[in-house]
C-alpha cells in the first residue's frame, strides 16, 4: 500500500473498486484544493466520468474514417487557433504542443493538425506500448507531408528528437505527469511543492524550440479549447514552472476536467 502525506492527512493510493476510487479522488481533491467533502466528492465523480469519456473518444476515433474524425474534431470551439496555426506555418522554429490530460485534448490536437500546412514531422512522445487502437487513432493525424512518428519512453531517442526540433519539426508531449514518467523537478503546482516531469521543457531548451500550451474543456455537450501564449524556453526549471502555472490556473477554474488527480500523491512524494 502506498500512502502520501498532506499535512497530517494520509491518502491511500491503492484503489480496488469504483467507489473506493471516487473516495480516493475525493480525498486528494479535498486536501489539495481545500474543498469541503461534498464539493470534493462532486469533483471526484465528474473527473472520473471525464476520464471514461476521454477513453471513449479514443475508441470512437479508432472506428472512424478520416472524414468522420475530422468532422468530430471540427466541432471544438478553438480560441486563437487561426493565429497559432499561422504562427506555426510561418515560423522556422520547432514547437512543442503541450497541455494537460483534460477535456478533449486529443480532438484539440487533431483540429490543430488539420490547420498545419508546412511540411514537418510531428513526434508524439508516448509511454504506453504500441497498440492497434493507437495506430488507428494516429492514422487520422498522419499524411505524406506531415507524418506522425511515435517515440516511446525508453527508446533512447532524445537526441534524435532534439535534432528534429532544431530543424523546425514539431513534438507533442503533455506535462501533467509524475516522476515515474521521466526526469522531474520540484515545482509549485496547485499551491504545493510537487515533483513534475520536465521533459517538454528540457526538449524545448535543448531543441531551441517554442512551447505551445493549450487547454481543453467539455461542458454541457460542447468541446472547447484555447491556446495560451507560446513560451520561449530559458532554463529548464523556469520554463517548467511556467507550464505548471498554466496548468494550475486551468485546474483551479476547471477541477472537474483534469483527469490526472490520481497522480497527485506521487507528485507530492508518495513512494
Give the location of each predicted region.
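Short, contiguous strand/loop micro-motifs
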Residues: 12-13, 71, 125, 148, ...
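Membrane-anchoring hydrophobic helices of lipid-metabolizing enzymes
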Residues: 1-104, 137-140
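Non-catalytic C-terminal accessory region of glycerolipid acyltransferases
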Residues: 94, 114, 155-271
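Short acidic-hydrophobic, aromatic-tinged amphipathic segments that line or gate anion-handling sites
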Residues: 76-81, 147-155, 232
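Catalytic core of membrane glycerolipid acyltransferases/transacylases, capturing the structured
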Residues: 94-153, 181-183
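A structural signal for well-ordered alpha-helical scaffolds and beta->alpha junctions
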Residues: 18-22, 131-134, 197, 240, ...
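Short amphipathic alpha-helical segments and helix-helix/interface helices
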Residues: 84-88, 109-114, 137-143, 161-162, ...
Amino acid at each position: 500500500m502506498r500512502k502520501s502525506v498532506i499535512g497530517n492527512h494520509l491518502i491511500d493510493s491503492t484503489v480496488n473498486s469504483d467507489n473506493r476510487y471516487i473516495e480516493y479522488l475525493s480525498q486528494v481533491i479535498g486536501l489539495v484544493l481545500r474543498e469541503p467533502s461534498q464539493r470534493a466528492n462532486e469533483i471526484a465523480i465528474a473527473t472520473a466520468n471525464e476520464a471514461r469519456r476521454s477513453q471513449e473518444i479514443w475508441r470512437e476515433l479508432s472506428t472512424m474514417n478520416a472524414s468522420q474524425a475530422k468532422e468530430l474534431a471540427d466541432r471544438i470551439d478553438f480560441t486563437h487557433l487561426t493565429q497559432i496555426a499561422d504562427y506555426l506555418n510561418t515560423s522556422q522554429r520547432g514547437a512543442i504542443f503541450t497541455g494537460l490530460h483534460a477535456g478533449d485534448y486529443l480532438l484539440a490536437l487533431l483540429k490543430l493538425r488539420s490547420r498545419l500546412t508546412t511540411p514537418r514531422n510531428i513526434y508524439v512522445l508516448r509511454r504506453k506500448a504500441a497498440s492497434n487502437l493507437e495506430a488507428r487513432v494516429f492514422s487520422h493525424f498522419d499524411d505524406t507531408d506531415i507524418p506522425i512518428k511515435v517515440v516511446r519512453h525508453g527508446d533512447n531517442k532524445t537526441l534524435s528528437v532534439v535534432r528534429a526540433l532544431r530543424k523546425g519539426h514539431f513534438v507533442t508531449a503533455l506535462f501533467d505527469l509524475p516522476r515515474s514518467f521521466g526526469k522531474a523537478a520540484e515545482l509549485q503546482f496547485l499551491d504545493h511543492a510537487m515533483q513534475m516531469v520536465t521533459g517538454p521543457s528540457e526538449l524545448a531548451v535543448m531543441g531551441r524550440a517554442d512551447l505551445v500550451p493549450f487547454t481543453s474543456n467539455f461542458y454541457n455537450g460542447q468541446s472547447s479549447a484555447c491556446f495560451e501564449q507560446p513560451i520561449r524556453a530559458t532554463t529548464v526549471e523556469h520554463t517548467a514552472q511556467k507550464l505548471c502555472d498554466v496548468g494550475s490556473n486551468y485546474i483551479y477554474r476547471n477541477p472537474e476536467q483534469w483527469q490526472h488527480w490520481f497522480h497527485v500523491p506521487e507528485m507530492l512524494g508518495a513512494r
